[in-house]
From Swiss-Prot:
PANTHER family xref list: GLUTAMINASE (PTHR12544), GLUTAMINASE 1 (PTHR12544:SF48)
Binding site for substrate: 66, 117, 161, 168, 192, 244, 262
InterPro entries reported for this sequence: Beta-lactam/transpept-like, Glutaminase
EC number(s) given by UniProt: 3.5.1.2
Official protein name in the record: Glutaminase 1
Residues passing through the membrane, by range: none
Molecular function per GO: glutaminase activity
Biological source species: Escherichia coli O6:H1 (strain CFT073 / ATCC 700928 / UPEC)
Encoding gene (name): glsA1
Amino acid sequence: MLDANKLQQAVDQAYTQFHSLNGGQNADYIPFLANVPGQLAAVAIVTSDGNVYSAGDSDYRFALESISKVCTLALALEDVGPQAVQDKVGADPTGLPFNSVIALELHGGKPLSPLVNAGAIATTSLINAENTEQRWQRILHIQQQLAGEQVALSDEVNQSEQTTNFHNRAIAWLLYSAGYLYCDAMEACDVYTRQCSTLINTIELATLGATLAAGGVNPLTHKRVLQADNVPYILAEMMMEGLYGRSGDWAYRVGLPGKSGVGGGILAVVPGVMGIAAFSPPLDEEGNSVRGQKMVASVAKQLGYNVFKG
């Protein structure tokens, strides 16, 4: 049994130590994100048996952004299976920025990872759907099943994203021209943009992690969301590419599958045990929350979790 006092103490200490850490800046290329108050910070644990511990602004709702890629990858694995995802999208780190097109050019137009923009757009196109709205509703539903029913699209975030997503539209057309997109290019880009524009809070984000930690069963609803056999593929991708250019450093220092988003959220999974999540808007140059990384790493270190430890 996990010690409840120790878990609450871990989140309290992480928050106290790092919630006002200086450094980083909000994402400024998406107008909505640029205007989120930079002083906000939160950290939370949800255990695989459904206990919740949090500190800070844990009820504040922020844009899910790239963490949504984890949810869409999970749905694609359910729909088409791990082999098809690997064959049609890939399962390798790019070593390049999350929105780079260079990796596409170097590999004949094939994306390498579902957790960078090109691969995520391709993954969105793999979802079984007869039309745009069905594709979107299925992705929203998997987000809600994994994290909580309150997860919903923000029209304000979506509008802010849709009017600035020219680079992603270009990526979609490159994928389409190379034969690695499996629906209309602009449909894929539209739905991908929507999936990034949902709002979540830190406890719900930790619940998403706890659902993965529990082998695909949401510990708060007790409902199976994913096949247990598909979860290791998700965690492997998170370990390889979840924090973009910081992924290797994260694996080296923290040793947990993780995923960040430019909305300021960051998630880590302790398989079989818990999800750890944090939120704070200022980002490092790779697009990861400066305070969030520190808070999640602090919780993991205090509790002694690292998947590479014996």
